[in-house]
Amino acid sequence: MYISDGEEKDIVPHFTFYGYRYVKISGVTNVSCEDFTGMALYSDYEGTGSIQTGNELVNQLISNVEWGMKDNFLDVPTDCPQRDERMGWTGDTQVFSGTACYLADTYAFYRKYLYDLYKEQLIAGGMVPEVVPT
């Protein structure tokens, strides 16, 4: 939210997203953490599998994997949401797809991605590109 003409307005970016752990705000005073809201963006899918152990460290690791999947499943499977590598890398997709299919119903997500891959293969003479879509 910002105020420039006397009226409060919310800022919600519609054409970009950022992955982050910390946010630094500068140039303003009298702000607190309660003045900000983070928003998790990810493709909609239903969770289908879960694991719970008696070890809190292992449970945290599993939670990190689940949130990592959410972080990287926004229209295409990416390898990291915080840098300019927010693209559908086919190698990363191949490595994580088994885990993803265990954790969630990924049928619609991967069907769309594999259709995009098929379209790229038509252009590339049947070769699988490193990134889909290119």
Outline where the language-model segments fall.
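Extracellular/oxidizing-compartment recognition motifs
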Residues: 1-83, 91-92, 108-117, 123-134
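Well-ordered alpha-helical scaffold segments within catalytic/enzyme domains
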Residues: 95-106
